[in-house]
Amino acid sequence: METKQIRNLFFAGQINGTTGYEEAGGQGLVAGINAHINCHGGQPFILGRDEAYIGVLIDDLVTKGVDEPYRMFTSRAEYRILLRQDDADMRLTEKSYQMGLAKQDRYDLLREKKESRDAIIRFVETYSVKPQYINSGLEKLGTAPLSHGCKLFDVVLRPQTTLENLADLVPALRAELDKVPASRKEEIIEAAEILIKYSGYIKREQIIADKINRLENIRIKGKFDYNSIQSLSTEARQKLTRIDPDTIAQASRIPGISPSDINILLVLLGR
């Protein structure tokens, strides 16, 4: 959000090539945070592509540029399962609390939700159910009976089951759900159920994001005179010089930068 020409001058919205609506609001938030950090000292606040749609938007503006007013569509994000609307508070509240933007009471609510959600997940991961106690109920729910005992987690994975309808079949699960604060019961149970049912997809996407994030930690800004690296393609030299990406991962997302160009930079860095 900070212009390269004038230090401490931050822009947001249409001047950056986006619409003036939600996209501008998101940029304004990040620009304001970083303007404050610049004045008082500290590391820049950067949201990753796996942390927030604002992170996707800003990264696209920096690495790809725009030919028409940019709109933030979910299709632009490669980590849509990690950027679900149901866990935005989990992803971002702690960051805002650390910067003084979220108050203590909001942070306490987040911790309460996380602890209750995780307790439910731990319970279903460790609690075993036996066919003779649950099969008649499973058949009424329209799902196949168990042929042998298994963890309750595996039963929750079935599309016909929910934590609530299984709690009617498993008294111990009902007792666990009753520990959740009554005022937030529906919200917290839903959060736990989503993590359980989508666990395989979430883990798979997180592994991919973690691999990319390792490249995000390799900083290259200011380390190269790209025009002097003759082994880079002409297009790569021109675009890397113009954009001056912060990290290897950011460089890899610039249109026209090939995997071989990235490998050359990694070799020069001794990686």
Question: Where are these predicted regions, by residue range?
Answer:
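Mid-to-C-terminal Rossmann-like scaffold of FAD/NAD(P)H-dependent oxidoreductases
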Residues: G41-K95, M99-A102, D108
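Internal hydrophobic alpha-helix adjacent to the cofactor/substrate pocket in enzyme cavities
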Residues: A24-L47
